[in-house]
Amino acid sequence: MRRHVFHPDEDLFITGILGSIAPALAAWRANPLPAYLKPNDRTDINSDPSLVARMAKYVMNVLNVGQPDLYLRPDEPGDVALLNAVRDNRVAPTMVLFSNLLKGKNEKHLAFALGRHMLDLYLPHYAYVALDRSPQNLKQIFLTCMYVCDMETGMPKKELEDYAQQIFNRLPGGARDQMRSLMRKFVEAGGSTDVKKWALATEIAGYRVGFLLCNDLVVAAHIISQEQSAFGSSMTPKDKIKELVLYSISEDYFK
């Protein structure tokens, strides 16, 4: 998937670094469930017979990501929300589906939407979810990783030390060593700290996955034209559709 689905701007080393610290980031920044969600109202995608639950299980298995807590809110407007939440004193990635996806949608519609959003459960991408999809937050955390590796960042040390404590006090030693090793390789490869470009590439990857799962450009374009703009996204619906059209005629798509 990395070679033929992920965008070239999704730097391999940034991805690895964020993946190594994602569990600690998620634990640090997890929030209680919103009041309108009750744990007993979860939909179990392993046993629920509804189409949306079966499609969620299918997409989860195809992408090989962890199982999210799933809540269905058919009477409330909206598309999809992915929350970095806490349940039973542990991090529980939580996906909430609203009326735009639960009314009048078939398998192809659900395959696109679920594929597009469930790729965010991939640990490096989930790190960005935990950071509220803020490019500024992402930059601060990446510079914190550089600081921990004794690299110059140009940021105030006190601020970076505070972030470092929050993250690295939650990381096992093996993950710290992995992060340091990846950071060295990142620097040796002349990597760019333009993490905003990386964030945009992860968004593009989500749309590509959704398109591959539904295998219908018309359906993909229809959903993109109707979806609400996500926080942190710099792409217009036209940009997203153009990206998928170009991808659909690329060599990567046919491999």
Can you annotate each of these PLM segments?
Residues V96, H109-H117:
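Short alpha-helical catalytic segment bearing the HExxH-like zincin motif
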